[in-house]
Amino acid sequence: MKSLRFSSSLALALAAVASLVAGSARAQAAPDAPALYRQHCAACHGEQRTGGMGPALLPESLERLRRPEALKVITQGRAATQMAGFAPALKAEEIAALAQWIYTPVLPAPTWADADIRASRVETPGAKDLPAKPVWSADPMNLFVVVEGGDHHVSLLDGDRFERMHRFASRYALHGGPKFSPEGRFVYFGSRDGWITKYDLWNLTVVAEVRAGLNMRNVAVSGDGKWIMAANYFPHTLALFDADLKLVKTYAATTADGRASSRVSAVYDATPRQSFVVALKDIPELWEISYDPKAEPLYDGLVHDYKMGEGVPKPGQFGVKRSRLDEPLDDFYFDQAYTHAFGATRPKGEGQPNAQVVNLDVRRTIARLPIAGMPHLGSGITFDWQGRRVMASPNLKDGAIDVIELDSWKPVKTIRTPGPGFFMRSHEKSRFAWTDSMMSPTARDTLTIIDKTTLEPVASVREPGRTLAHIEFTKDGRYALASVWEMDGALIVYDATTFKEVKRLPMSKPVGKYNVFNKITRSEGTSH
């Protein structure tokens, strides 16, 4: 018995040693992802993965790129870019290690200070001397800027003939919608990894570029065209530029006492107020930053003792006016008077999404919107219905359009759709609103058309088995343009009255299209 116990113990010990040896061998054979990155990737994507010739490879920048897609890109490369596939050079396990490693945080965390922003700026020689008139013959007010996310290009479309006029390469992953100067000559693009590109539409050339941050949400252009503001996720900052993309100042996205900081959810221009309005992702505040040279001075908090210096104001222009909220806003849009901001909250953990109305004059939440699910208020529209002003918004969770009266903040109707959607669009001269169901696995191929006078669905158009989304109208509202949101996609032109297809242009995942006139006139049917 003693011998048997000894043999068993010896066997267990030998098995343990064998397991350790095997584990050690596996560890030694495991690919060294940091070394592989330095050898194959750093030259284009930067030593700290902050980007260079190629985009940033930070977790914040890759949050919308699924890991299987990242693996595919490393393996096969990207068409029409300098990203070559590494399948011939690396083993499958090495590629897998790289794909996993780029989603891990960089330590120590990279920084992006004012000096870095200024050093990043480049200007195209001679761009300022280009003629102040288009080099092409189309209507500059009915021009469409089409962002093709499939191969990171931008197409310019004649909105009368529906012909592509020009196509050029863009920065990686443009986001948040391009913004136009007030006369429609210049367009400003913001990329996920922080670059702002100023492009001269009339002369078909880049004017200047600057990197505002390492991970950026969107940009806004002031109504007078003099100022550009960028909202950053990383670092937690806002960056203010002049029209030539020269840095004016940065704002730390923190509470007034500096104890908490936040990602910046979005920044939008409020032209009638001569200000930028800013939502913070992690702090329950909505900021308003005036660019009016005659803006009234700002006082932080209550002034009750001038001897303590509490009555000393801050300059009104470019100062931060804070509206304190119960919960942070993920995104928002305005009523046509720009008195109210409608924002959606995406709480963490067990909390439920909700919507709130912020009065920008009294600087507080004045109503909660009775919307279930996950409202996508950043894509809402407003219009008149039976003598009342209403807003309508798609829902990211439920197949529904919620219609709310703006005077009472009470629900008017919930319009059922085939599935949850992301975009809703209309036009002042059109009777109809169009919405997609692109968040639905079964109805992503369907656009639902709603009669704004009856609030009833009246028709639908389909692209079977493919994603159909993001409507934009021509400046006169006669035609509606939709995206087949696929790599081998297309731009489809529909008659906005009969809903019949008029023309189809092949494009590479046209994620968004933007009409110059509708954007600069702040059409009630599109995002601002």
Predicted features along the sequence, with ranges:
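The canonical Cys-X-X-Cys-His
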Residues: 33-47, 98, 154
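Extracytoplasmic electron-transfer domains, predominantly the class I c-type cytochrome c fold
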Residues: 43, 48-52, 57-106
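Repeated scaffold domains used in trafficking and secretory/extracellular systems
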Residues: 131-133, 174-179, 215-221, 260-268, ...
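Residue-level detector of Asp-centered blade-edge/turn motifs that repeat once per structural unit
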Residues: 138-140, 182-183, 223-224, 271-272, ...
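Short loop/turn segments that connect beta-strands within beta-propeller blades
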Residues: 159-161, 200-204, 242-246, 291-293, ...
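A short beta-strand motif characteristic of beta-propeller blades
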Residues: 163-169, 205-210, 247-258, 316-324, ...
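Asp-box/WD-like beta-propeller blade repeats and closely related beta-sheet repeat scaffolds
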Residues: 212-284, 302-320
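Loop/turn-rich, solvent-exposed surfaces of beta-rich toroidal or solenoidal domains
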Residues: 420-489
